[in-house]
């Protein structure tokens, strides 16, 4: 199968399916045609015995994928096209689940920006027996609380399985992490230098492979150690666990703002300032999301994400967040609840109300 649209190129070579993201001006932000093209390819390759593995990558150095097409979703909502928004997220989450349950190694090469929807089309690789490769340029994040959203695309399932309170910390703050952090947190599996990726892809297209496991082993032989590069998350782990292990956003803030003196004080002050810039409602929704994901399947996680997405557009902060951060860029969002301390438990629980009967949920058929 070979398919080309302006935003993506899909081809096969030497028993491997290749998906190249090609929307560089938008940092490969996912459009509906891109979602559909990737899903069609996976459906075609799933039961094709001549395809042993899948590699998804970006030929552009700045970004693997910066997320979903947020401007498109904002414009659709402003136009009252709510069905378009729901269709986009439903299609995206179906794709995330198809990757998570793909029966062959799925390999993601994660250079540059890897955020939001980019995490959704890459994190499932580990579950398939594949590998997530990060590089020196990797900038990984789920920054959704900055725009009044939450860490969707099933990523709460992965964040809930990171060491200690790292998942809650990343979900609430939207902090950007590098390759060393991603490896420490279990959000990546191997490291390669950026300038080694083009040669790796060329070799994968030329070298014959008999099995998917053979493809993975070959990639692992090309990976290298980060050597003495330390993970900031690892160094800050004690602080993170102390302040983010339990409680809502207000409790985390109170804990951070109670610190006085020393190295922890500087870190706590920076982190508290970051939290104060986020949507208070989204922070609490995101912390709750990680807690719930700990005991959920991926299918349950994605069904929950879809309900939350509708709630955030209906009565959450996402429209104001996108306006302030991305459209007008005044960086002065007026959140529905101004202070973290004023978010009520009822407001958080309301966001989790399921708008569908169980059998009518658009993702009812998903099963891990």
Regions found by a protein language model. Give the residues of each.
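Hydrophobic/aromatic residues within transmembrane alpha-helices
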Residues: 56, 69, 121-122, 181-182, ...
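Glycine-rich beta-to-alpha active-site loop
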Residues: 99-147, 169-179, 190
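Contiguous mid-protein beta-loop-alpha structural module that forms a pocket-lining wall or clamp
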Residues: 154, 161-214
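C-terminal amphipathic alpha-helical interaction region
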Residues: 308, 316, 320-368
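Substrate-recognition/cap regions that form aromatic- and gly/pro-loop-enriched pockets
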Residues: 253-262, 267-307, 311-317
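Conserved CoA-thioester-binding segment of acyl-CoA-metabolizing enzymes
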Residues: 1-57, 97, 366-368
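Glycine- (often His-adjacent) and acidic-residue-rich active-site loop
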Residues: 58-94, 146-148, 351
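Amphipathic alpha-helical blocks and their helix-capping loop/short-beta junctions
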Residues: 193-275
